[in-house]
Swiss-Prot record:
Fe cation binds at H111, H115, D305. This is tRNA N6-adenosine threonylcarbamoyltransferase. Keywords: Acyltransferase, Cytoplasm, Iron, Metal-binding, Transferase, tRNA processing. GO terms for cellular component: cytoplasm. Its cofactor is Fe(2+). Substrate binds at L134, V135, S136, G137, G138, D167, G180, N277. The lineage of its organism: Bacteria, Pseudomonadati, Pseudomonadota, Gammaproteobacteria, Cellvibrionales. GO terms for molecular function: iron ion binding; N(6)-L-threonylcarbamoyladenine synthase activity. Binds 1 Fe(2+) ion per subunit. Required for the formation of a threonylcarbamoyl group on adenosine at position 37 (t(6)A37) in tRNAs that read codons beginning with adenine. Is involved in the transfer of the threonylcarbamoyl moiety of threonylcarbamoyl-AMP (TC-AMP) to the N6 group of A37, together with TsaE and TsaB. TsaD likely plays a direct catalytic role in this reaction. InterPro entries: ATPase_NBD, Gcp-like_dom, KAE1/TsaD, Peptidase_M22_CS, TsaD. It comes from Cellvibrio japonicus (strain Ueda107) (Pseudomonas fluorescens subsp. cellulosa). It catalyses: L-threonylcarbamoyladenylate + adenosine(37) in tRNA = N(6)-L-threonylcarbamoyladenosine(37) in tRNA + AMP + H(+). It is an enzyme of class 2 (transferase).
Length: 342
C-alpha cells in the first residue's frame, strides 16, 4: 500500500509518500519559523493561511520525488488532531478532497501517535511492547505501548509541557523563537553548577510532571541577577540556560527510568520535538544502560512535525482495515488513549 501523508497541525507543512513494501519514498517539510518569529510564537490564522499556500506545491514535489502518479497512491493520511483547529482543517479538507477526487480512502491520524511511531521509520526500529516518552511543546506524557493503538497513559504534565517550558525560559533570556533549540545551544557554553534549579516532583511517587515551578525558579534567578548586577551578560545567560536544561533533562530521565521499572519493560521510545535534545538523548542512554534497558528515537528531521510519520501511522491503520466516511472531523484536543487498537 502506498500512502500520501499530510501534516498541518501547527506551524510546519509536511508531506510524504510511504510504501508498505518499499518504505519511505520521499518527504518534504516547510517550516513557518520565520513567519512567526517576529511575534514570538505561532499565530494560528497565519499558520492556516501559510498551509494553504504551501500544501499543493509540496505535494507536487513529493509525488515527483517518489516517482508516484495519482494512480500509484492507494490512500491519503492527514493529521486530524490534536493541534490548531484552523491548521488541522486545511490538511483535513485538502486530504479528504483529494482522496475523493482520486477515488481512494482517506484516514485521519492522531498527531501524537504519528510521533510515537516515527522511530519505526528507522533501520532498526523498536519492538513492542515499550514505554514511550512523548515530549514536545504541547505534550509531556509517559505511555505504556503494547501495540499500535493499545496505549495506557502512565503519567503526564499537570501544567506546562517540557517544550513549552523551554520556549518560555528562552523568552526570559531574550532568545529568539523557537526557544527550545536556542536554550540547548546556549547551554553548551554554560558553566555547570553556577545556578541550581529544582527537579519538580521527582521526590513524589508516580509519573506525573510539572514544569511551572521550574519556570518560576528560572525567572527568579534572572530577576535577582538584574537587581544585583543589571542585565545578565552572555555568560550568565548561558549558565542559566545550562542549569535550566539540566533540571528538565534530569526530571525526564528520572521519570523514564521509574516508568520502566514500574512496568518491567526494557525498551524506551522518546518522540516529539524535545526528543531531538542532545543532552536528553545522551543522559537517557547512560541511565538506562545501568538497568539493562535501551532507548530508541527518530532521526532529528523526524523529531519535529513531519509528513512521514503521518503517512506511516495512516498506512498501519489502513492496512488493519480502518475506514472512515466522507465527513471531515478534526479535534483540537484528542486523548491518545482514546484511539482504537489494531
Amino acid at each position: 500500500m502506498r500512502v500520501l501523508g499530510l501534516e498541518t497541525s501547527c506551524d510546519e507543512t509536511g508531506v510524504a509518500v510511504y510504501d508498505s513494501a518499499q518504505g519511505l519514498l520521499a518527504h518534504r517539510l516547510y517550516s513557518q519559523v520565520k513567519l512567526h518569529a517576529e511575534y514570538g510564537g505561532v499565530v494560528p490564522e497565519l499558520a492556516s493561511r501559510d498551509h494553504v499556500r504551501k500544501l499543493l506545491p509540496l505535494i507536487d514535489e513529493v509525488m515527483a520525488a517518489s516517482g508516484s502518479t495519482a494512480a500509484d497512491i492507494d490512500a491519503i493520511a492527514y493529521t486530524a488532531g490534536p493541534g490548531l483547529i484552523g491548521a488541522l482543517m486545511v490538511g483535513a479538507a485538502f486530504g479528504r478532497s483529494l482522496a475523493y477526487a482520486w477515488g481512494i480512502p482517506a484516514v485521519g491520524v492522531h498527531h501524537m501517535e504519528g510521533h510515537l511511531l516515527a522511530p519505526m521509520l528507522e533501520a532498526v526500529p523498536p519492538e513492542f511492547p515499550f514505554v514511550a516518552l512523548l515530549v514536545s511543546g504541547g505534550h509531556t506524557q509517559l505511555v505504556k505501548v503494547m501495540a499500535i493503538g493499545d496505549y495506557e497513559l502512565l503519567g503526564e504534565s499537570i501544567d506546562d509541557a517540557a517544550g513549552e517550558a523551554f520556549d518560555k525560559a528562552a523568552k526570559m533570556l531574550d532568545l529568539d523563537y523557537p526557544g527550545g533549540p536556542q536554550i540547548a545551544r546556549l547551554a553548551e557554553q554554560g558553566v555547570h553548577g553556577r545556578f541550581k534549579f529544582p527537579r519538580p516532583m521527582v521526590d513524589r511517587p508516580g509519573l506525573a510532571f510539572s514544569f511551572s515551578g521550574l519556570k518560576t525558579a528560572t525567572l527568579t534567578a534572572v530577576n535577582a541577577h538584574k537587581q544585583a548586577n543589571g542585565l545578565p551578560d552572555d555568560q550568565t545567560c548561558a549558565d542559566i540556560a545550562c542549569a535550566f536544561q539540566e533540571a528538565v533533562v534530569d526530571t525526564l530521565v528520572i521519570k523514564c527510568r521509574r516508568a520502566l521499572e514500574q512496568t518491567g519493560m526494557k525498551t524506551l521510545v522518546i518522540a516529539g520535538g524535545v526528543s531531538a535534545n542532545k543532552k536528553l538523548r545522551a543522559d537517557l542512554e547512560v541511565e538506562l544502560a545501568r538497568i539493562g534497558a535501551r532507548v530508541f528515537y527518530a532521526r532529528h528531521e523526524f523529531c519535529t512535525d513531519n509528513g512521514a510519520m503521518i503517512a506511516y501511522a495512516g498506512c498501519q491503520r489502513l492496512l488493519a482495515g480502518q475506514q472512515e466516511g466522507l465527513a471531515i472531523h478534526v479535534k483540537a484536543r484528542w486523548p491518545l488513549n482514546s484511539l482504537s487498537s489494531l
